[in-house]
């Protein structure tokens, strides 16, 4: 999927599913690269600082299904979804699937036409991309476009890898982040919504003058999904285990400290044109404020347990 800028207004939709890599310890970088070698002849992108991550090459998935619009129309969406897997810190895994939504036409094209536009679905008839992107976050018709199903299939493939021992120190719930973005208009607007214990939605409107790419929009939503999952997971472990007298409870708390806390670095990769989205989230719902409260409670609990045991952690 090209990283280039699109001329004029364009819309994107996607879904990121985030969870813990099923392994006792963080996977070393060389094994992460092997795990993510999903497309023959394509390289795995990786970096080590400030937080190590690696991402697989894109896989394309052909689709031909309805995409319900806000007006109630059901134009067919024909084209390809681009899907990839991202591993952060050798510990957190994300299945990420997305597509540009573009106007098509009244006539169906040969598949060679759609394959020449990787990561783009075209709406038939008079389907409006921005209208379809707005409806995507709330429309749940079973036969409609479902990037999350592709993300889930990728995660199942990763879980089956012999590189993983499936001996995770704890088993947190996975989260789903569905997102839509429209590039056009004059100012940045964004909304992050907690729908339920598993599902979140992000709605973005980005000014064309920001000059953002598809890759930057995708990376922003993956970063939001990562930090939402970290906050959700740490908060749940602390809430469930802080007052638990079971010796295994301390193991869970220590596992969180040793394997997850250092991955918190919000907005580290966000381009200037999208920085306002993270600034808004820091106000409401206040990710970092909530994170600091959770971490302080976690460390206080470990200190109390150490005092009861006669030792204080250094």
What is the predicted role of each segment?
Residues 223-225, 229-314:
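Membrane-associated alpha-helical segments
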Residues 1-195:
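Short Lys/Arg-enriched alpha/beta "domain-start" segment
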Residues 181-245:
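Extended, charged amphipathic alpha-helical segments
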Residues 55-83, 206-209, 232, 295-313:
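Generic hydrophobic segment detector
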């Amino acid at each position: 999927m090209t990283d280039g800028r699109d001329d004029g207004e364009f819309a994107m939709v996607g879904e990121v599913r985030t969870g813990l890599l099923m392994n006792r310890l963080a996977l070393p970088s060389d094994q992460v690269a092997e795990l993510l070698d999903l497309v023959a002849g394509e390289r795995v992108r990786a970096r080590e600082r400030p937080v190590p991550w690696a991402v697989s090459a894109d896989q394309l998935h052909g689709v031909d299904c309805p995409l319900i619009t806000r007006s109630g129309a059901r134009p067919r969406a024909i084209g390809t979804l681009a899907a990839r897997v991202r591993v952060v810190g050798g510990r957190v895994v994300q299945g990420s699937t997305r597509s540009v939504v573009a106007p098509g036409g009244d006539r169906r094209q040969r598949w060679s036409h759609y394959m020449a536009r990787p990561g783009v679905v075209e709406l038939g008839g008079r389907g409006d991309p921005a209208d379809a992107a707005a409806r995507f976050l709330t429309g749940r018709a079973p036969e409609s476009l479902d990037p999350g199903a592709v993300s889930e299939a990728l995660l199942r493939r990763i879980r089956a890898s012999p590189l993983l021992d499936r001996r995770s120190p704890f088993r947190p719930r996975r989260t789903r982040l569905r997102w839509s973005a429209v590039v056009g208009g004059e100012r940045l607007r964004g909304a992050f919504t907690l729908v339920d214990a598993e599902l979140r939605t992000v709605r973005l409107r980005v000014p064309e003058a920001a000059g953002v790419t598809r890759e930057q929009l995708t990376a922003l939503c993956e970063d939001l999904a990562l930090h939402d999952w970290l906050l959700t997971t740490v908060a749940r472990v602390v809430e469930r285990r802080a007052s638990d007298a079971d010796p295994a409870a301390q193991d869970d708390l220590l596992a969180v400290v040793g394997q997850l806390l250092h991955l918190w670095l919000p907005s580290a990769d966000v381009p200037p044109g999208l920085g306002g989205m993270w600034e808004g989230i820091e106000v409401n719902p206040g990710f970092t404020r909530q994170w600091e409260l959770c971490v302080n409670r976690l460390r206080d609990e470990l200190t109390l347990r150490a005092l009861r045991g006669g030792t204080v952690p250094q």
